[in-house]
């Protein structure tokens, strides 16, 4: 799904997942919700703050669906806007259904999508970084980058679920 508010602002996959997650957690407190490694840390923080269990997954449609089954997650999403609903749906992504669920959220409030956008945490993230690397050394390179990041004081966490991710 893609969503743009009345101010012309794009709501990215992790922002939409926060909105879907907030609504779900009102109905099912403590629900497990999955994001992928490209989602901002704000997603995971916001879902936990709302009383959910936030889980980070590797990137990819089949990997997210498998993680949903493994964790019993009711909701999952990717930065690409693929949103997977197991709550009141069949556990896969469907853009029309995701749109209907967004309309449901809007119908349950007097706020506009622009108002809901304003309620989201301000996010800063970097684009995905891909560096050409021969297959025979790529795992060693990721391990070395991971170790260097762990050695830096300003890095608050290093996540190696899928490649390497650093939070500052």
Which positions does each model-derived feature cover?
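Short, acidic/small-residue loops that bind anionic groups at enzyme active sites
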Residues: 10-27, 32, 58-59
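Short Gly/Thr/Asp-enriched flexible loops that form oxyanion-binding sites at enzyme active sites
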Residues: 2-16, 43-44
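Phosphate-binding and adjacent anionic-ligand microenvironments
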Residues: 28-168
């Amino acid at each position: 799904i893609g969503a743009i508010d009345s101010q012309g602002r794009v709501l990215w996959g992790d922002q939409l997942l926060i909105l879907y997650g907030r609504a779900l957690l009102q109905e099912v407190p403590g629900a497990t919700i999955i994001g992928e490694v490209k989602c901002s840390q704000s997603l995971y923080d916001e879902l936990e703050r709302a009383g959910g269990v936030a889980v980070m997954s590797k990137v990819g449609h089949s990997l997210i669906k498998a993680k949903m089954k493994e964790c019993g997650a009711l909701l999952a999403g990717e930065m690409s806007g693929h949103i997977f609903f197991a709550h009141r749906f069949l556990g896969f992504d469907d853009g029309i259904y995701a749109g209907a669920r967004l309309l449901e959220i809007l119908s349950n409030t007097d706020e506009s999508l622009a108002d809901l956008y304003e309620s989201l945490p301000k996010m800063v993230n970097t684009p995905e970084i891909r560096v050409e690397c021969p297959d025979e050394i790529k795992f060693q390179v990721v391990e070395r980058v991971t170790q260097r990041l762990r050695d830096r004081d300003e890095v608050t966490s290093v996540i190696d679920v899928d490649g390497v991710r650093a939070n500052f």
